[in-house]
Each structure stands twice: as structure tokens, then as C-alpha cells.
Amino acid sequence: MNYNERSHAIDLITEINSYLKDVNLKIKKAGGETTLKNNSEIHGKTRKILFPDLLLFGDENKSTLMQGWEIKLPDVEVSDETFINDAIYKAEVMNLNSTILWNFKEIVLYVKNKDGWKIHKKWNDLIIINNRDDVVKHKELWIAFLKDKFLVELNMYFQNGKITTKPLYEITDNIIAFLINDFKKNVGSFLKENAKHNLEIQAYIKKWWSFSEKEFLADENDPFVAYAKTILLSWITRITFAHVISKTHNKAQLLNVLDKNTTPEQLNNLFQEITEESDFYTIFQKQKYDELIPDDVWKTILDFNTFLIDKLLTHQVLQNLLEQTVDRYKREIIGQFTTPEKLAKLLVKMTVKNLNSPILDPCCGTGTIPKQVRSYMQSLDISESNIHNNIWASDKMNMALQITNLALTSTESMNHINKIFQKNIFDLNSEQKITFTSPSDGSQLNLQIPRYTNILSNLPFIPFEIIDESDKEKISSIRLKIKDDSEGKIQLSKKSDYYYYIIIYLHSLLDDSGRIGLILSNSWLATDSGRELFKAISFYYDIESITISGKGKWFFNANVMSSILILNKKHTNEKSERIIQFIMIKDNINDLTNDEIDIISRDYLLGESSDYYNKSSYSMNEIESFLSKNISLNSMFFDISWIHKVEKIILPLNNLFKVIRGMRRGWDPLFYLPKDNDVEEEYLVPVLKSARNIKSFYAKPDGTAFCCSKTKDELKAINHQGALNWINKFESSVNKTGKPLREVLAKSNLKWYEMKPDNSLAEFITSINPGQRIFWSKLDKPSFINQRLIGLNIISSDKYSKDLMLALLNSILGLFFIEASGFGRGLGALDLQKNNIEKSYVLNPDLLSNHQINLIINSFKNLGDNIPKDIRNSIIDPKRVEFDKTVLKCFGLEEIYLEIRKSFLYMINTRLSVNN
């Protein structure tokens, strides 16, 4: 927009506002003067402008946006594509469904409907204005048209709802999204270009990415573009927050006088000055290299600042703007890892019994849990002073703390300290002092970390394989402390995930009446390492409850199932007789209303039953008895009180079978051959590759494995060219990470291309990750199996009939023990481990007479050969019911059939509900 266009646009704004003073229309104010002044060129080139030349508002404070206008002079026709596209682009940015094209000759109203942007009306009243001189010459004419006709007609569209309006915070959220998506690649490329001349930039961003890739920015794979997003969001967030606090912080008001010549360095210096008089360091802290931003992008960021300048915003609008900015930051940067608000609310209300006491979230992420604590306190009329005195939040990652600080700040709390700080959880102790800045006078305050009455957190899920090197020494000391405290009775596995150690470490931060509420992955409920964790937790705490979902995932975009663990600090290491509650919430938390969450937490705290959850309660003695039979903690959410009735008819599975895991060699294309191949017969071994191909209780191999132990020279000597060619085909190949197969497949006592099936032959098999099909299948003769299968071999093959063993394994009790050994993954599959199957139980065949054996085998044969597609349907089929009752009757326990079936079906339905 050139000077003449800007001048006439400002005249237009002035005339609209003079008219609106004397009338009562839906339109209350026009604006845009400030952003017009910034619409300069960059090095002689035009740049993309986000904001319309003129804005109409629905209130005097300019907090409700109605419409944007694009202004040109008559020499630009309203049919000009660039003119039209610019107007529509800016309307999209503002999330508005209409726009005006005004060139002082013709005026066009575009409205967006389901078919896109369409001309809704065109005004030709000023057709005599043909050039720039005419605009001045006929000024009275276009002013009269504007006031007497156009604004009146336009107002009617707002009155009848044809044109929608948007509150400022929604507009701002949309603008932020456009800023990020339009400019992240530009900024990323600019960073890369600068990194060519300064390798420190590249080193810093790559190191940052090594920490951030797994936890942040799941939608980005270029570290420079990902870092560009953090730079853009940092500028936008700081500018927005400075405007929010400008009424109570004089320095922040200096943003109102920034102009198009302000540099990133100057604005960073201003934010530093604001920080010195406030406690918002984590918000205003400079991002490293944030000054490396292209001029056109920087001018647009200044436009955004200018857009916010003249808005006289109420406290509520400011708060909405603040919360919307926080939500946008979460979506753009952290996404799937953010704790859902309703889950955070439930955690807080189930755990906290005393709100007037210190509360900590040591892995606060974006502050969802502390924010829910704050809301809970506000609902009970606890003063802002007490709220800020008692809420503490920390995190290892500084980026997350910026959002936490925003989340805990309101327009009513500007003069209170947010006790938010960066610290590795394993470095926290109650003797430390943390330095904060008083927002009221800028003074430095050293506050001691207290013993906490409540600790609440969504603990990070970091597998043991990728635990940071800097934490390994601390983790080793925690493992040693557990061993020493328990006199060697409890030893956490070295394969324990990161959060295991956090749970134990938190004990040192609690006061004597302390409670802990944690959101965890559910994997610990059915693994060997999880059992050791359970022992360790029971040693240091009274476990009050474990809660899971009975319907679907709690985290929308992450393929994990979760649990809530609530603990009370134990005062003695003596064995507790406390009853542990296993709670399963019937509906997905995210589908519940806030009132329903209140009811759940109230019923829970009162120890009452509830319409919203099922509860099973067991003593430690009962739990230890279940665990001794390899029934996982995950199974205890269901009524399995009948288990003690079967104790005399079952025995450990490894008394009868040797359990094997199928062969894992590392590169299937090499070791599993296509049907058409030229490899010599002696190197071909039938293999069962996948449970997916098993349709019958009597399985057959479904593939061919390459098993060659000869050297290449030996193959050449006997002219086995087929095997030699097959090996040569892969000799120069690399894996998915670019490493040579010769290196990654190398094993002691094996050639890199060698696979020996000897220890992977099985008589019975099942899937390692069953879904709806849970079964055992029998092979005609021991066959080679792939890593995706678990196999069994009868130890005393001359003593037990294979047909009998197949029937007992597939009985309802046999299948129950499979389901009870594992836990549900985020996609609904059951996660089994060889170790868990090995420790599982089966019906004892030694208790059966020959007559009973024949009854069971014949009843099983009546089911037919085919494995049912869904066990839930087949289990209630009359023939299947007859078979299961026959088995139980032979063992003298037919009366508990329905109890077993109910538990079994409920467990499977819950696991598979994630796919609903």
C-alpha cells in the first residue's frame, strides 16, 4: 500500500468513526491506522501482510472483530486477482467469513459459505470515480454514500447473522497459527543459511534437537524448522503476555511505541527490562538465536504487536487471550504429550485432601496439572495469595516452563510470585533455596523448598534404553538405596523405565502426611520389572488405589494406555494390611462432564461405590497370592476372587512345557525367502512366520527360512550357486539407519548371514501380541517359528497326549491365563512376554482319568478346526460353552464357569475398547 492509499484508508476510518458516534449500529468502531503505518516494503520488495487495511469492531474496546476491508484506489479494479486474493487471505487469517474490497469506485462484499468465497453484493454507486484525482474531487460523494447507504446496508448483514463476528482471542489464535505455518520454513532456512557461517548455530540446534525430538514437535522432522517454530512462538507469546500485563507493569507499555524500525535486539532488551521488574523470567527469557529472523517475518511480528496496541481489553478478554495463547503453544509444540484437562482435573480431585498446604508438580510440562490445582483452589474461594504460596512447579525442560508460567498467571495475580523453576527432579531436595523475582517490586527472594503435602504429576515415559547419561548415576544410587533399605529383598531391574525411579525419589520430598497422585503408562502393571516396582512402592508407600480406563485411551494422539496411581507416605517399613483399590472408570474421561468428574472424585474420597466406575479391592496377601500365579496387576481391576478356588487344579506351565520365543535374527528380507527362489533345498527350512496366517488349531508352516552354516568358500567349492547368490545379494546392503548388514547381523559363533533354527522349534504356538483372537495352535511336528510367536514343547512327550494339552490350553481357564499375563497396548493388542507365559499356570492333566481325558478331547474336537475370528463371540457359542463346562466338570469346578467367563470377557472388552 503506497502513501496515497494509506492516507485515503485513514480518511475512510476517520469518517466511519465520526458517523458511528451518532448512530446505534451493530458496528461500533473502525480501526487499522496503526497497522497501516507498518505496511512498508522490505529492501524494495512487497511483503505478505496479515492484517486488513481497515477493521470493523463490534464494541468500543475493539475486542470483537466483525470484518476486514482491503483498500485500493480506482486504478486497481475490484476484479484484480491479487486484490481479491489478498482480501480473502487476510479474512482467513482473521478467521472471519466476510471481507470488503473497496477501491472508491466499486465496493464488493465477499462472503464465505460451504462452497467457498463468493460475491454476495456489489455496489456501483460511485462509478463516476475513475482515478486517484477523482477520489479527492468527489470526497463528499463517497462520504455520503458511506454514511447514508453503505454502512446501513452492511449493518443489516450483521443483524441478520449473514456475517459472523469473532472475539479477539479467537482471532489471535488463528493469526498465531498462520504466522507459524506461513513462516516456519522461512525462518528455518534463514537459520540454516546463518549456520553455514557460524557452525555454533548448527551445533546448538542439533544438540537441542537430540533432547527435544522425542518429547516435542512430533510433527516436524527438520530440526531447523522445529526450532524456528519455537522462535516464532516465543516472540508471539512474549508480545501477547506483555500486552496482558501492561496495565500493571509500566515497562510493558513501551510495546505501544514500537515502530517498523524496531529490531529483535531492541525488543529483547525491552523484555529484559520487563523481567527485571517482574517475576516472569521464564516467559520473557530470550530464545538463543531468536534474533536470526528474516526481515519480512520480523515486520509481520511487529504488525502483530501493533494489532494488539489499541485494544482496550477487559480482564476476561485478556484472560481468554492468555489461555488461547497457551493452548496454541501446546498444540504447536508439545501436542500429544499434554495432559488432557479432564484427566488432570480427576487426578487433582482424587488426590488432594488439603489444599491449604504445599503442592508440587515436579514434571509440570505445560502446567495443565498446576492449573487444575489453581482452579480447584479458586472454586473454594482460596485467596490468590494462598494459591501462589502453595503451588510449586518445576521441569527439566525450560521451554515447558514458559507455558506453565502463562497457565498459572491471571489478570488478578500479576503481583504474586509464580513458584515455577527449572530443575532436574533428582536434584530437588527440601534443603534447597530457589531464587524468584518479586513482580511487585523486582526484589530477589530466596525461598526454601518445603516438604510437600501433595505431589501430583504426569510422569515422563522414557524407556530405559534412552535414559539421559546425566541421570544414570542418580538412578544407580536410587537402585542401591532400595536394595539397602530392603536388605536386598527388592532390586529394581536395570531395564526399569525412567519414571520408576521418580516414584521412589518423591518419597524424600513428602511431609509425614504426604500424598502422591501420578499418571503413568500402564505397562508396569504386567511386566517383570513392574512387579519389582510394585514391591518397591509397597515398601515406601501405602498404595491407596490404581485407576485405569474402561473405555479407550486418555491421551488422544499417543498410542499408550495410562493409569493413575495414588499413594500415601508410609510411616513404617512393616508390611501394610491396607486394602488396595483397583478402579476402572466406565466411560472415557474425555467424554465426561466436569460435574461427572466431581461425582467420581467425591465418591472415591468417601470410599463409596459409584455409577461411574467399577471397583475391586484386595488385601496385600490376596495380591501376592495372585502375583505368585503370574496373574498381573492389570487383571485385578476385574473380579477374580474365584482364583483361590482353582488353586488345587492348576500347576506352573513350565512344569509341563519348555517355553521358547521365536527366532529373532534382525533382517527378514535376508532370512525369509520368497516362494520363487533358486536356493538349494538343503538350506531351506519350513517356518511359521506370523499368527495372522494361522487359521486352524492345527497349524502349518507358512514360509521358508534361509538357514546356511557353510562359508562362502565352501559353497563355491560344491557349486551351490543359489545360496551363494542369495548371500551376495545382501552383502553390500545396509539397514534402515544406513549401517551395513554385515556389521549389524554379526554374532559370535554365527556368520552374519547364518540362522540356526535348533532352539526355535515348537510344538504349540500363540501370538506374542494377540488381539481378538486368543488361542493355542498345534503343529504336526516341531517347526521353526518366527520372533512374533511364542512356542511350547512338552517336557514329557511320552506322558501327555498332545491333543489333551491342546484342549486344556484352549479351555476358558487356559485362555484366561494368557490374558491375565499381559497388558493392553494403545492399539488394543495384548502385550505378552516369554517370561510371563513361562511363569503362567495351566490345568493339571495328572488329575484326570482316562475317561475324563477322552471326554475333554472329544468335546474340543466338536469345536471344529477353525480358530474363531473373535473369541468374545465364540466363547458364548453353545458348543464352546459345552466344552468349557466339560473341562471344568472334569476338575470338579463347573459351578465357577460363569465367574471365569465374566472376568475373561470383561478383560478382553476393556483392552479392545481402545479401538471403539
Predicted features along the sequence, with ranges:
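Amphipathic alpha-helical coiled-coil/heptad-repeat segments
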Residues: S811, H851-N916
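Active-site metal-binding core of divalent-cation-utilizing nuclease and nuclease-like domains
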Residues: K26-K62
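Nuclease catalytic cores
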Residues: M1-N17
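P-loop NTPase catalytic cores that bind/hydrolyze ATP
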Residues: F224-K251, S457-N458, Y500, S508, ...
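Class I S-adenosyl-L-methionine
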Residues: T248, E276-M350, G824
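Signature of N6-adenine DNA methyltransferases within the class I
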Residues: M94, T99, E106, Y110-K149, ...
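Charged, often flexible domain-edge or linker segments that flank or initiate folded functional domains
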Residues: P52, F57-D59, S63-I88, E92-Q287, ...
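Polybasic, glycine- and aromatic-enriched phosphate-binding surface used to engage nucleic acids
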Residues: E624-N862, K869
